[in-house]
């Protein structure tokens, strides 16, 4: 191995030497040392709109006590679950106690991981008042989103969540702006090129 390495340093024409222009790494968001990226991919990255220009990525709620605040949807009275609410204001002023909860989960591409509901009576006042809980980005609760789990054993998988879900700290979510639909965003996130780039 040492002899081949020395030969590759001395002779740029050996067939096992791979050279890249280091300035190209600066063109890739986050500047990873991605020696495998071709000129064509660099060109696509340079010409493409940045993800941060069309979405807002947010992390959600951490209950700090899932046994107290979370249930599987079939464990509670069905008529106490608030489906399809579009804002925390509407949820707070309803007679509903439990609301759909995006907690992430196993590999599910396009759709899925919708098993949980969260105790969110009167707009989640118990969670807001719990000193151990962290309620992040509540202004984004109940909005349409694309989500993925923070822990995965294989490739990332992105899923669609319609309006009406509160999201967890492990069910990361992105919220499309008016320049892209959630369905188009989902298609982009689940395609092979995007998978290769992340």
Regions found by a protein language model. Give the residues of each.
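Basic, amphipathic alpha-helical recognition segments used for DNA target recognition
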Residues: 149-198
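Polynucleotide-recognition surfaces of large bacterial nucleic-acid defense/processing enzymes
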Residues: 1-129, 134-145, 151
């Amino acid at each position: 191995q040492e002899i081949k390495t020395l030969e590759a340093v001395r002779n740029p024409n050996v067939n096992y030497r791979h050279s890249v222009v280091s300035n190209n790494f600066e063109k890739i968001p986050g500047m990873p040392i991605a020696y495998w990226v071709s000129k064509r991919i660099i060109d696509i990255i340079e010409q493409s709109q940045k993800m941060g220009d069309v979405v807002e990525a947010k992390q959600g709620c951490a209950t700090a006590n899932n046994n107290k605040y979370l249930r599987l949807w079939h464990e509670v009275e069905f008529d106490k679950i608030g489906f399809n609410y579009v804002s925390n204001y509407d949820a707070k002023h309803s007679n509903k106690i439990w609301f759909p909860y995006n907690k992430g989960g196993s590999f599910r591409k396009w759709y899925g991981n919708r098993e949980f509901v969260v105790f969110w009576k009167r707009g989640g006042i118990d969670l807001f008042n719990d000193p151990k809980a962290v309620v992040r980005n509540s202004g984004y609760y109940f909005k349409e989103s694309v989500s993925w789990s923070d822990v995965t054993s294989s490739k990332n998988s992105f899923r669609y969540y319609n309006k009406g879900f509160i999201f967890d700290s492990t069910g990361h979510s992105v919220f499309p702006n008016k320049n892209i639909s959630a369905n188009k965003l989902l298609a982009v996130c689940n395609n092979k090129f995007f998978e290769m780039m992340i």
